[in-house]
């Protein structure tokens, strides 16, 4: 494939990037880019040694289990010698796709959050009634997804670039987790303004939790592909 044919070129390019990043860090007084990154990413309460212990634990406990999951997927897809390019392939007959159409998905999301709790019902009504989603794809639109805030309006805003894959639902529920946290925090007078947005050490708790809390409503967004989606996430 392409990557094998350009392995040497890509290795050289990667080496140049690493050297350049280290040089940038040294200009700013750091030993290397790794040391700078702890500051740049707002790491608090832990350092390189803690990360090493965590990394070793992942290698010891998580990797063997992940290898079992990947082996099951390979038997399901029939791919005998997978490369990293095959990682997204979950089923021989195609990956699960969500229901089509912005209006249909937004309607499903409103139903989902109304059934989840009164608080999330209020949240999703505010988001949709005030058009605080920019998630449809269009020419020239940047890739990725994120949640940001419009403080003057106490309004979260969600940006994404749907591409008619299961990732559309992932980004919807994930960013709604961030947005719901922001919506609640901005309305709580006990929370100072500079703490309304959590640090990077805790922000993903809200987003990942929302992905799991909305699992009972997968059928609203996937229809006949619900089982495939849930198997793929197992």
Where are the regions that the model predicts?
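Cation-handling catalytic/transport regions enriched in His/Asp/Glu
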Residues: 1-233
